[in-house]
Amino acid sequence: EPTVLPARIPQLLLNGSAGIAVGMATNIPPHNLNELIAGLLALIENPEITDQELIQLIPGPDFPTGGQILGREGIRETYLSGRGSVTMRGVAGIETIEAPGRPDRDAVIITELPYQTNKAGLIERIADLVNDKKLEGISDIRDESDRDGMRIVVELRRDAYPQVVLNNLFKLTPLQ
């Protein structure tokens, strides 16, 4: 039984791949189908297309979990040389949570994770950092994800500075 079916599109770029062979590791991220097809059509029409023109058609990877790519230089370097790194960051914002019977509190709301980041592992890592007193200002962590989308609520203490806590989350956890 075949494990890979042939296709007229580059499945390796479409689905991405990760592996190690003969001491070399590779990690190819998934890409957007429409962008890949546009790049292929341009390459078929003009086999002498420049790297810059191709990069404009296929601007970067398309990660299924969302997240933000920080900077375009890492993508460009990877596409041109075959080596490079792409820094990913989850999407998080600061909101004020109103609860009846208690004062309003700020919270960090995480709505998207970087590619291949485990949600349960992230929550566990945040809890460990809070318990070890390496991450200050957090009073509660809740996973409010449902079928409408992912939502992790990191409730802050009243004396905490929300932007400082958010920066520490990026620095100390797999959120970046």
Q: Where are each of the predicted segments found?
A:
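Intrinsically disordered, low-complexity regulatory segments
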Residues: 1-15, 20-176
